[in-house]
């Protein structure tokens, strides 16, 4: 009985952590991070990245 209670609490904690991560991931969809697919119909790259026309991925700007 004691082991079942511990497993239930750990499972519930894991479920809450995963639900939080999914929610955070959905709210970050405003701009694309490093190696994010960019281009027509896709979210724009975040301010510190540029969309590579050759690869169609967000990357660091070339100096």
Swiss-Prot record:
Signal sequence annotation: 1-21
GO MF term set: ion channel inhibitor activity; potassium channel regulator activity; toxin activity
Tissue expression profile of the protein: Expressed by the venom gland.
Residues cleaved off as propeptide: 22-29
Subcellular localization: Secreted
One Gene Ontology term, aspect cellular component: extracellular region
Domain of life: Eukaryota
InterPro entries: Huwentoxin-1
Transmembrane segments: none
Intrachain disulfide bonds: 31-46, 38-51, 45-58
UniProt-listed Pfam families: Toxin_12
Main location: secreted
Keywords per UniProt: Disulfide bond, Ion channel impairing toxin, Knottin, Potassium channel impairing toxin, Secreted, Signal, Toxin, Voltage-gated potassium channel impairing toxin
Protein's job: Gating modifier of Kv2.1/KCNB1, Kv2.2/KCNB2 and Kv4.3/KCND3 channels.
Entry text on domains: The presence of a 'disulfide through disulfide knot' structurally defines this protein as a knottin.
Similarity-based family: Belongs to the neurotoxin 10 (Hwtx-1) family. 44 (Jztx-4) subfamily.
Protein name as annotated: Kappa-theraphotoxin-Cg3a 1
Upper classification of the organism: Eukaryota, Metazoa, Ecdysozoa, Arthropoda, Chelicerata
């Amino acid at each position: 009985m004691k082991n079942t209670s511990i497993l239930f609490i750990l499972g519930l904690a894991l479920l809450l952590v995963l639900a939080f991560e999914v929610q955070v991931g959905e709210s970050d969809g405003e701009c694309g991070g490093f190696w994010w697919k960019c281009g027509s119909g896709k979210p724009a790259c975040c301010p510190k990245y540029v969309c590579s026309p050759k690869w169609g991925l967000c990357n660091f700007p070339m100096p």
